[in-house]
Amino acid sequence: YGEYASQPLVLNFHRTDHKDGSATYFREFLRQYMMAQRPNRSDYPAWNQRQYVIDSIAWVRDPLYGWCNKNFKKDGSPYNVYTDGLKVYTTIDSRMQRYAEEAVYGHVARYLQPEFDKEKQGQPNAPFSDALKPEEVRTILRNSMRQSERYRNMKAAGYTEGEIMKAFRTPTDMTIFSYHGDLDTTMTPMDSIRYYKHFLRAGFMSMDPKTGYVKAYVGGLDYSHFMYDMVTGGRRQVGSTIKPFLYSLAMGNGFTPCDKAPNVQRTYMVAGQPWTPRNGSHARYG
């Protein structure tokens, strides 16, 4: 006993936070959803009033939305997802989640990103389109700066716009993302914003069409560096998912799968003005 008691106690302990482990984007989405406050219109900017309506409906109709602020502990305080010992059961399949994360990361890192970098190589406006003017690029970077955590913290601390801009143009030590692992480097925060604009973003969500159960949820490549959730927050074109709705509407109005339509370019009057849909390839068909 004395021999073992004299040996140092070694613990292989690692505290896991919300940035570690599997399904990080889904876990954070669930935390925000369950801990949402009752929507207040004044908390939403003018351009995002639609989100206020969506959240207000969810607050009334969805018991899970804001659950922690609708249900209270014995002392009357609201629940906290992380500190009150709640057990939250989800429909995520751990194997599908792992496959999804590997597939998204692998496809972007090994295929899409190299193709994008090859296309932008040597272009002075990279990663932006050459069609953008320098002032338009600066506007994009300034808007991204104002959305950053560094900017919000400095603004809350009382710094002026000029002081914040100076800080964003001052080189500082930082850790940045790369596909080969995090890199320690020195650059200005504004340069880091442009650096991150080079990275393609991707999202993936797998759902059982019969039950609506979400089986896999990948909001991005790395939650530590890209916290914007491309599943619920990313805006994208509707794509081919519109087809079932469009075809259902057509058949509801008397069309059948056997009907034929001329494969020609059409022009429609919209608000008194002619409008002609065009393909991205500029081909005049389809």
Where do the model's predicted regions map?
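C-terminal domain-closing interface element
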Residues: A283-G286
